[in-house]
Amino acid sequence: MENKFFAAFFLLLVLFSSQEIIGGEGRTCQSKSHHFKYMCTSNHNCAIVCRNEGFSGGRCHGFHRRCYCTRLC
């Protein structure tokens, strides 16, 4: 009986510890910047260009280092 209790407790512990905590910020969508033309080397510069395009931010992404703008979906 004690072994079954321990097994059930351990299973519940593993189950609850593997649950991801989801914040209230929602999903983030990405779109390639239309105004950032060259290789993206600075996330800060990318974010400034994206804010001027009406997005909430931006970051350099991918092998070719392109600027992708981000916003809440």
Swiss-Prot record:
One of its GO terms (cellular component) is extracellular region. InterPro entries: Defensin_plant, Scorpion_toxin-like, Scorpion_toxin-like_sf. It is found in: Secreted. Disulfide bonds join 29-73, 40-60, 46-67, 50-69. Keywords: Antimicrobial, Disulfide bond, Fungicide, Plant defense, Secreted, Signal. Residues 1-26 form the signal peptide. SMART domains: Knot1 (SM00505). The keyword Disulfide bond applies. GO terms for biological process: defense response; defense response to fungus; killing of cells of another organism. PANTHER family: DEFENSIN-LIKE PROTEIN 1, DEFENSIN-LIKE PROTEIN 6-RELATED. Confers broad-spectrum resistance to pathogens. Belongs to the DEFL family. This is Defensin-like protein 6. It comes from Arabidopsis thaliana (Mouse-ear cress).
